């Protein structure tokens, strides 16, 4: 049986992070393969694993590496399948590995998750696979609910046990609150409800990056919709739009400021969420607040301002079961299409 996911470690010392990934994949009952191959010390082995794995039917690759973590990028060089990068903290708090993984050139994206977040790498892989496998999607939803319940239970297990003189534990007790999902519909002037990809731009100054996503999706003939909605200024509108577009397969958040777009999206859907961190007018970028998400809510982060790679990553995900799109994607990645 061909596994659905291949995990490649850059070194045996990365096994602790891989164990986080394997624990999730075992829980979700997703077949996987684990290999150790270095982008620098065994480049031919990396190539053979990726090429033969792709030809055999691997759907998603996960590259786990620290230091100058070029492994995920090396994997992306030899496959049209989605590649997830998990940077490992070895030195300088893992920032060297993070930048090596996320700042990939067009058209070779790596869907990077937070430093040491092997668990989120596996959850992201499951979200991708859940687009094509209803049983996996159901398990992703169950896992998502488990993370939600853990937060709710912490109120009883931690907060309710605090016995300070002036704390009012029974005020708005969490277990008694009724938490309902949004059912409101978005009332925009025009939306494409048949969109496979939804792009949400957090503010108008980030539209230049959003347009890069849109142009590349057009070249790949992927139907999409794009709106400018700030989840901080327009929270109700944001939730209504996500609810209205719930049948889309991929959500892309264009982030600046505190990167609330992609973070807000990933909590509202079980679909893959791609984050594009942007620079603001002061030259600050919001990479860290996009990528370093807590357990259970991965954001597939691409490089700063790299909207085109977000679109290519969408194409890689959607082409898993779409040979027509795969042909377009391969032409683009082989630079036969002039973007």
Curated annotation (Swiss-Prot):
NCBIfam families: purE. Belongs to the AIR carboxylase family. Class I subfamily. The gene is purE. It comes from the Archaea. The keyword Coiled coil does not apply. Catalyzes the conversion of N5-carboxyaminoimidazole ribonucleotide (N5-CAIR) to 4-carboxy-5-aminoimidazole ribonucleotide (CAIR). It holds the Pfam family AIRC. GO terms for biological process: 'de novo' IMP biosynthetic process. One of its GO terms (molecular function) is 5-(carboxyamino)imidazole ribonucleotide mutase activity. This is Probable N5-carboxyaminoimidazole ribonucleotide mutase. Pathway: Purine metabolism; IMP biosynthesis via de novo pathway; 5-amino-1-(5-phospho-D-ribosyl)imidazole-4-carboxylate from 5-amino-1-(5-phospho-D-ribosyl)imidazole (N5-CAIR route): step 2/2. It catalyses: 5-carboxyamino-1-(5-phospho-D-ribosyl)imidazole + H(+) = 5-amino-1-(5-phospho-D-ribosyl)imidazole-4-carboxylate. It is an enzyme of class 5 (isomerase). It comes from Methanobrevibacter smithii. Keywords: Isomerase, Purine biosynthesis. The keyword Isomerase applies. Substrate binds at residues 11, 14, 41. The lineage of its organism: Archaea, Methanobacteriati, Methanobacteriota, Methanomada group, Methanobacteria. HAMAP family: PurE_classI. Its EC number is 5.4.99.18.
